[in-house]
């Protein structure tokens, strides 16, 4: 299985253990990410529950149903080899979250210094290709 960002989150929530997993910039704690966005938008859980959906000033729509779904579908524990590529400048998932996940699940974590959540520069794409070759 190869998944990126929120795709990794959904894969970890939905799929049984694959033979191997390559996760690029994975969202490993969607609830925490949503709560951070709510805090940034000044939205409480009570307000979100009452209104159902709230458009935040930074372009995201916060959804009570989605927050509840995330809480009801936590990330599963896989027992396969897991390889993670993470950029040190990732703004979506804190480094401590990725490191804790890697320790708990025995994942091989590779951190690209200066990498971002979205690997898109020539240097980032080269690091991505190299990581894929080493991990498969």
Predicted segments, located by residue:
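Short, catalytically relevant binding-site loops at active-site mouths
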Residues: 6-9, 28-30
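Short glycine-enriched nucleophile-adjacent loop
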Residues: 8-21
């Amino acid at each position: 299985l190869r998944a990126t960002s929120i795709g990794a989150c959904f894969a970890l929530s939905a799929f049984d253990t694959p033979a191997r997993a390559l996760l690029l910039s994975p969202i490993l704690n969607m609830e925490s990410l949503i709560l951070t966005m709510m805090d940034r938008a000044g939205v409480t859980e009570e307000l979100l529950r009452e209104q159902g959906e709230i458009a935040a000033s930074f372009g995201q729509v916060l959804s009570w149903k989605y927050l509840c779904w995330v809480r009801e579908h936590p990330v599963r524990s896989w027992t396969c080899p897991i390889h993670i590529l993470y950029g040190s400048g990732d703004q979506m998932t804190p480094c401590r979250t990725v490191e804790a996940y890697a320790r708990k699940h025995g994942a091989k974590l590779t951190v690209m210094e200066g990498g971002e959540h979205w690997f898109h520069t020539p240097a980032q794409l080269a690091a991505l290709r190299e990581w894929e070759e080493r991990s498969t």
